[in-house]
């Protein structure tokens, strides 16, 4: 258990940051899911539109330290390849 005031504050801050990061990751997953759903349905226009929305969302996740840049690049590359194959 944290005893010092600083350690208690760090716990509070960590909890707040974890909540924000969880929300950001959830948002990224939702955008990626939209692309995957459109690809599964074979709707190229919807897939391209969803991909255009998902890319900046992943970039924001990278900028804010939620996901690693290589992870975002890999996900975007794979999504792009799947959309292009339609």
From Swiss-Prot:
<dbReference type="Pfam" id="PF01649">
    <property type="entry name" value="Ribosomal_S20p"/>
</dbReference>
<comment type="similarity">
    <text>Belongs to the bacterial ribosomal protein bS20 family.</text>
</comment>
<keyword id="KW-0689">Ribosomal protein</keyword>
<keyword id="KW-0687">Ribonucleoprotein</keyword>
<protein>
    <recommendedName>
        <fullName>Small ribosomal subunit protein bS20</fullName>
    </recommendedName>
</protein>
<dbReference type="InterPro" id="IPR036510">
    <property type="entry name" value="Ribosomal_bS20_sf"/>
</dbReference>
<dbReference type="GO" id="GO:0015935">
    <property type="term" value="C:small ribosomal subunit"/>
</dbReference>
<keyword id="KW-0694">RNA-binding</keyword>
<keyword id="KW-0699">rRNA-binding</keyword>
<comment type="function">
    <text>Binds directly to 16S ribosomal RNA.</text>
</comment>
<dbReference type="GO" id="GO:0070181">
    <property type="term" value="F:small ribosomal subunit rRNA binding"/>
</dbReference>
<dbReference type="GO" id="GO:0003735">
    <property type="term" value="F:structural constituent of ribosome"/>
</dbReference>
<dbReference type="GO" id="GO:0006412">
    <property type="term" value="P:translation"/>
</dbReference>
<dbReference type="InterPro" id="IPR002583">
    <property type="entry name" value="Ribosomal_bS20"/>
</dbReference>
